[in-house]
UniProtKB/Swiss-Prot annotation:
It is found in: Nucleus. Signal peptide: none annotated. Belongs to the class I-like SAM-binding methyltransferase superfamily. mRNA cap 0 methyltransferase family. This is mRNA cap guanine-N(7) methyltransferase. The keyword Membrane does not apply. Residues 136-419 form the mRNA cap 0 methyltransferase domain. Residues 1-88 are annotated as: Disordered. MRNA binds at N145, N146. It catalyses: a 5'-end (5'-triphosphoguanosine)-ribonucleoside in mRNA + S-adenosyl-L-methionine = a 5'-end (N(7)-methyl 5'-triphosphoguanosine)-ribonucleoside in mRNA + S-adenosyl-L-homocysteine. It comes from Eremothecium gossypii (strain ATCC 10895 / CBS 109.51 / FGSC 9923 / NRRL Y-1056) (Yeast). Its main location: nucleus.
């Protein structure tokens, strides 16, 4: 016999019956036949359906039928589903609160941002395996970013080059380098899950004919020698060093930024190129200049992305950054980045560091300008699928709507050429 739980006080009887089924009224017990009753006319015969229903009822064995309930399983399952959704939402809220706590700790220099970044990209790698990229709400933005990287990589990479990519992620650029016919690719990333996924992708790319070495390691916080020492097959110095959408993590401190650029310089041949994609500090300043000094945490964005600064120190310092390093904001990008701490890269600071470590500026342009200048010669090189993915609603190529600000305006491309080896100051002799 199915039992119904006790009705909560906040639930109406109608809701309760709808959720757990309505209790049928029990039928009166059959009266035993008596000798004097035999003369009474018999009742009308039951219909076949009524007989079937009665026959299916369970009996107590004493002539009394048990009551039974119409349990509405589908509604009960819906109730369980709602409960699971509530628990998932609660767990997600707790995770976001913990993450926000970590971000605040990073802003106050209590914890290193590397841990937050590593955990984020490990988690994103896990979720990325479970859905089709083509259904992403930012598929146009992803196509645009891929086109930018195709053009940038092709511009500075030559056949038989040895390539080092710092922050290689899940290996999304392996095919781009394959088109350049390089001889070796060395990819390093702080996320062990991203490296594992990059290895899986590489094994499925049977048409790549160059050597691929994938390493888990810290590209910015320590010497690259620590990460690459177990891999003697790496052919240093390299012809190309690339950093795509990750160098901003190095500008947490001056020490970290210097270590990152020193790693680049030491890994690169004289005449080789260092190129990449970074947030455009001028666009960020343009946005920050719109806020008054009373706004404690300046923020802006749209349905695709959002930027939130940890404080209003820029405004309070007469609309200038107090220091080139440690200017933190959290960045959210739909279906890609979940409020991860990033740091402003004042481009003149990057240029000065590169100059100090033996590299001269070759090119720096916002995404939109670089795309407009390079796209005419690329339309016949892109695959039909990518060309279709770049087409806007007006028939032109690029990004539009909310995606335009998040991609075309927020980022810039750069390239430096190494002109001399950096020689560290030798210790003074007594």
């Amino acid at each position: 016999m199915a039992l119904r739980p006790e009705k909560p006080v906040w639930m109406s009887q109608e809701q309760y019956d709808r959720q757990y089924g309505k209790l049928e009224e029990p039928k009166p017990p059959r009266e035993e036949s008596k000798p004097g009753d035999q003369a009474k006319p018999s009742a009308e015969p039951k219909s076949g359906s009524e007989e079937k229903t009665e026959g299916s009822s369970s009996s107590t064995g004493q002539g009394e039928e048990r009551p039974h309930f119409k349990i509405q399983k589908r509604r009960h399952q819906n109730y369980d589903l709602e409960e699971r959704k509530k628990k998932q939402q609660l767990n997600k809220l707790r995770e976001e609160q913990l993450k926000q706590h970590d971000i605040e700790m990073a802003a106050n220099k209590v914890v290193n941002v590397d841990q937050i970044v590593r955990e984020h990209y490990n988690e994103r790698t896990f979720h990325a395996k479970r859905y089709n990229r083509n259904y992403s709400p930012i598929i146009k933005l992803r196509n645009f970013n891929n086109a930018i990287k195709y053009m940038l990589i092709d511009k500075y990479t030559r056949p038989r080059d040895v390539v080092l990519e710092l922050g290689c992620g899940k290996g999304g650029d392996l095919r781009k380098y394959g088109a350049c016919e390089i001889s070796q690719f060395i990819g390093i990333d702080i996320s062990n899950e991203s490296i594992r996924e990059a290895q899986r992708r590489y094994l499925n790319m049977r048409d790549l004919d160059y050597q691929v070495i994938l390493i888990t390691g810290d590209c910015f916080g320590e010497s690259l020698g620590v990460a690459v020492q177990p891999f003697p097959e790496c052919r240093f110095p390299c012809d190309v060093v690339s950093t795509q959408f990750c160098l901003h993590y190095a500008f947490e401190t001056e020490e970290k930024a210097r270590r990152a650029i020193l790693n680049v310089s030491k890994s690169l041949k004289v005449g080789g190129f260092f190129f990449g994609t970074i947030p455009d500090a001028e666009f960020i300043r343009y946005k920050l200049n719109k806020f008054s000094k009373e706004v404690e945490r300046p923020s802006w964005g749209n349905s695709i992305y959002k930027v939130v600064f940890a404080n209003n120190s820029y405004q309070l310092n007469d609309y200038e950054f107090e220091t080139p390093y440690g200017n933190m904001y959290t960045y959210w990008l739909e279906d890609a980045i979940d409020n991860v701490p990033e740091y402003v890269i004042p481009f003149e600071t990057l240029r000065n560091l590169c100059d100090e470590y033996g590299m001269e500026l070759e090119m720096q342009k916002p995404f939109n300008k670089f795309f407009v200048e390079e796209i005419p010669q690329w339309m016949n090189k892109f695959s039909p699928r990518l060309r279709e993915g770049l087409q806007r609603s007006d028939g032109k190529y690029g990004v539009e709507g909310d995606e335009k600000e998040a991609a075309s305006y927020f980022y810039t491309v750069f390239a430096f050429r190494k002109v001399k080896d950096y020689v560290e100051n030798a210790p003074a002799h007594a």
